Regions:
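N-terminal capping/lid subdomain adjacent to the active-site entrance of alpha/beta enzymes
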Residues: 1-144
Length: 144
């Protein structure tokens, strides 16, 4: 089995306030594992300044994972215990490798017919901006 990753810098459509500052970009890493003719893809996503595993050696740990991808999964998880976003991406990639192009969890959401009702994200801002987002989410059917 082989593994590699690619870093992407996503640009937010608008500056987005959090409890720890304003975000305009987001780094994410796409992990790809391959075995014979099959491949699996997973996302290792961190928010700088917010994520538990936002540490200087993040890419170094991704490189380590790629070099050690043939280790037992439990050994990989143990060595990655302080990098939950990398574990998540690795689990996604293994599921994708196992299931091929099939969706992980077929649903109304993955078919674009519905949304995840608990993920109505509200960005920090002044009271008027936050209130308008709340009203918009309620109008869209978010209720929790």
């Amino acid at each position: 089995m082989q593994a590699n990753f690619q870093k992407y810098n996503l640009q937010f459509k608008q500056a987005s306030g959090t409890s720890r500052g304003v975000l305009t970009t987001k780094e994410t890493y796409i992990l790809e594992i391959s075995k014979e003719e099959k491949k699996g893809i997973g996302e290792c996503a961190i928010f700088r300044g917010l994520s538990y595993d936002d540490v200087p050696e993040y890419e170094e740990k991704l490189n380590w994972l790629c070099q050690n991808i043939n280790q037992d999964f439990d050994i990989l998880k143990k060595d990655l215990k302080h990098f939950p976003s990398i574990i998540f991406g690795l689990e996604q990639a293994f599921l994708n490798l196992k299931n091929g192009s099939d969706l992980y969890f077929p649903s109304e959401f993955t078919e674009g017919k519905d949304f995840i009702k608990i993920n109505g994200l509200i960005w920090m801002g002044n009271a008027e901006f936050m209130q308008s987002q709340i009203e918009e989410k309620l109008d869209q059917g978010f209720d929790c």
